[in-house]
Regions:
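Amphipathic, interaction-prone secondary-structure segments
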Residues: 25-56
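Charge-dense, low-complexity intrinsically disordered segments
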Residues: 2, 6, 74-81
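Intrinsically disordered, low-complexity regulatory segments enriched in Ser/Thr/Pro
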Residues: 51, 55-78
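Well-ordered alpha/beta subsegment
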Residues: 76-100
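Short, well-structured alpha-helical interface segments that form or flank functional binding sites
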Residues: 10, 42, 82
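Intrinsically disordered, low-complexity acidic regions enriched in Pro/Ser/Thr
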Residues: 2-6, 39-42, 57, 93-100
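Generic structural hydrophobic/aromatic packing signal, biased to beta-strands
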Residues: 8, 12-15, 61, 87, ...
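Negatively charged, low-complexity tracts enriched in Asp/Glu with abundant Ser/Thr
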Residues: 1-33
Length: 100
């Protein structure tokens, strides 16, 4: 089943390599693109960009790929403020229109 999102775009950031991948039906689609390009799973974090919003309202740090107890992240939301800040910085760099 193909899912079309009209209000947001799914994305994944590699906080070590400083790159992001956007789009796909699932966060795992962008995750696979980065992993296939040499990223390590421990550095990949999922997020959502909300269309029509700006600033902090435009980004959400939630994805099923963020669940990783071995890295002390037990839920879908990125719990580590340092990791969240790195993801935010990358999204701001690559999508400056968001005004992050």
């Amino acid at each position: 089943m193909r899912v079309h999102y009209r209000t947001f775009i799914k994305g994944v950031a590699d906080i070590e390599r400083g790159v992001i991948a956007l789009g796909g039906d699932w966060h795992m689609d962008a995750n696979t693109v980065l992993f296939s390009d040499g990223s390590e799973q421990k550095n990949l974090w999922g997020f959502n960009i909300y269309l029509g919003k700006s600033g902090d309202e435009a980004i959400e740090y939630e994805s099923i790929i963020n669940i990783r107890p071995a890295q002390n992240n037990r839920g879908r939301v990125i719990e580590d403020e340092r990791v969240r800040s790195q993801v935010r910085s990358l999204v701001a760099q690559f999508v400056p229109e968001l005004g992050l």
